[in-house]
Design a protein with these regions (language model features):
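C-terminal transmembrane helix and the adjacent membrane-cytosol boundary/short C-terminal tail
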Residues: 219-223, 227, 234, 261, ...
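Membrane-embedded alpha-helices of multi-pass transport/permease systems
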Residues: 41, 45, 139-144, 163, ...
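Transmembrane alpha-helices
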Residues: 217-218, 225, 234, 240-278
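Periplasmic/extracellular loop-to-transmembrane helix junction in inner-membrane transport proteins
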Residues: 12-23, 28, 48-133, 153, ...
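Generic hydrophobic transmembrane alpha-helix motif, especially the helices
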Residues: 165-210
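Interhelical loop and adjacent transmembrane-helix boundary motif
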Residues: 189, 274-325
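Transmembrane alpha-helical segments of polytopic membrane transport and secretion proteins
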Residues: 1-33, 335-347
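Cytoplasmic-entry segments and transmembrane alpha-helices of multi-pass inner-membrane transporters
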Residues: 26, 140-179, 217, 345-347
Length: 347
């Protein structure tokens, strides 16, 4: 084979053609990677910019013209635009400390001075729904994954895996109506203390949604454990259950923890199920029978509303989204740290 024609069978006539094609593929891959980085950066910039506008929304602007700045003493006063004469009510200023530590969320009802923006009322609803969902998804997902990986016959596995994948492909709005029309009446049949909208029904539906995620990822982690570890356990006289729980699961703990944290992030960011089944009354509660509102539920309510883009109530959507972004990012970083720690331990 001539140096200028190393790969004639693949259609390349010269080294220059090979290098040109390789450079093109490399450039395309680099552009895709750069696009993902720029998209993430743009999301972060938009979130934090709009959240900053929320905390600076004590400034009243009319068609780009500065009108006045609100203070705690002047909140609720009426001012007029010097250009068009339009009337504006000065909003009560919201500090970051009041937002992040407040427990009352009431931005839609009452005067401007009565509006409350305590994000813990929304965080509590998100936490209780996520907790119920994880109580369903984590144990059932782990048990299902162990069964599929260690016990199930290949024919049974070939039937169960597509079923789980179908569950993962069902639209979340279907889960929301299922929670509202099936799970809630079932809960009320066993206990009449459940409201029509409640956190338990939403949490159960979100848990069913996350079950395929947990089981699939955990099974992949279990399948990645070397066969030699299992054979060593059997050689020592261990039973299948002992090998599964004392050898395989600890060896796959890195992937298992990553699956759990990914599922938690999924539950925290779930939108349609909680918007349909949990309710829209934000208040600080840990009673799973009560209606509640999550952070994503509030964002949906504001996105579908008729508030002005300069209104403090509308801008609160971005402040809540920033808190949600920080929570999910913290979970992702924690997942990477846990995965690296246990990976080093078992390698």
């Amino acid at each position: 084979m001539k140096p200028t024609e190393p790969n004639r069978r693949f259609g390349f006539r010269s080294l220059r053609g090979i290098y040109t094609r390789e450079w093109g593929v490399k450039s395309l891959l680099a552009a895709c990677a750069l696009l993902s980085v720029l998209t993430t950066r743009a999301i972060v910039v938009v979130l934090f910019t709009e959240a900053t506008r929320f905390f600076n929304s004590d400034r009243v602007v009319c068609d780009g013209v500065y009108v006045a700045t609100s203070t705690p003493e002047t909140a609720g006063d009426v001012v007029h635009c010097p250009e068009c004469g339009a009337s504006h009510v000065l909003p009560a200023p919201v500090t970051f400390y009041d937002f992040i530590t407040g427990t009352e969320w009431n931005p839609l009802i009452g005067k401007e001075t009565d509006k409350k923006f305590g994000v813990w009322a929304l965080i509590s609803g998100t936490l209780i729904v996520s907790l119920i969902a994880m109580l369903v998804a984590i144990p059932l997902g782990l048990i299902t994954a162990i069964y599929l990986s260690e016990y199930a016959h290949p024919r049974v596995r070939s039937l169960l895996k597509p079923t789980l994948e179908v569950l993962a492909g069902i639209p979340t709005v279907v889960y929301g109506f299922f929670a509202l029309m099936v799970i809630t009446p079932g809960l009320q049949f066993f206990h009449d203390g459940f409201n029509t909208f409640n956190a338990t029904a939403a949490g159960l539906a979100v848990g069913i949604l996350c079950l395929p995620i947990v089981s699939s990822l955990v099974e992949d982690a279990l399948q990645a454990v070397p066969r030699s570890l299992r054979e060593g356990g059997y050689g020592m006289g261990a039973t299948k259950f002992e090998v599964s729980t004392k050898i395989v699961v600890p060896a796959a703990l890195s992937g298992i923890m990553s699956a759990f944290l990914l599922a938690i992030s999924r539950t925290v960011g779930e939108t349609m199920i909680v918007a349909l089944a949990a309710g829209s009354r934000p208040h600080l509660t840990m009673d799973p029978r009560d209606d509640t509102q999550t952070m994503t539920g509030w964002m949906v309510q504001m996105a579908l509303g008729d508030n002005s883009n300069f209104d403090m109530t509308y801008l609160s959507m971005y402040a809540v989204a920033t808190v949600l972004f920080v929570i999910t990012m913290s979970l992702t970083i924690s997942g990477n740290m846990v995965r690296n720690r246990f990976r080093e331990e078992y390698q």
